[in-house]
Amino acid sequence: TERVHKMSKDTLELLRECDSGIKMAVGSIDEVSGHIKDEDLKNLLEKSKEEHSRLGGTIKEQLASLGDDGKDPGIMAKSMSWIKTNVKLGMNDSDRTVAGLMTDGCDMGIKSLTRYLNEYKGADGASRSTARRLIGIEEDLLSGLRPYL
């Protein structure tokens, strides 16, 4: 039963971190979308936002089944992201700047999610698969952003 408790605790924590990461990603995309000039870049980010949101719905269901309502990104992380985004775009409002900011965000997301996968080893298969799907969405976006850097 100790193992079962650890598994459900790890499952819950991993899903909460995925939920937080999705909210951070969607918020970041919303924040830069008004600064994008290239239609293809706009479409790339919009498609990624839809993928994040769709997976977010699945995560909400998984969390609800565990009696949890999710996790918002930390105020410090959100504030630092907002400041970095607005300062950089204030200095150079270009698609290259947007792509650079989003690339940094993807890198941080992939690194954090991978760390959480390693940390919450007891999480069940479904939640681990969800985290890997989210990493895949981030990796796809990262790859799509490269031509704009």
Q: Model-predicted segments: where are they?
A:
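Conserved alpha-helical segments that form or flank metal/cofactor-binding pockets of metalloenzymes
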Residues: K42-M76, L145-Y148
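Short, flexible helix-adjacent loops and helix caps
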Residues: D30, G34-K37, L41, A64, ...
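Alpha-helical bundle segments that constitute or directly flank the non-heme di-iron/ferroxidase center
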Residues: M7-I36, T97-K121
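Short, Lys/Arg-enriched N-terminal segments with co-localized hydrophobic residues
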Residues: T1-M7
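Carboxylate-rich helix-loop segments that flank metal/cofactor sites and access channels
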Residues: T58-I110
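A structural signal for well-ordered alpha-helices, especially hydrophobic packing surfaces
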Residues: V26, G56, K60-L63, K84-V87, ...
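Alpha-helical scaffold segments that form or flank carboxylate-/histidine-based iron centers
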Residues: D10-C18, E39-R54, D95-L101, A126-I137
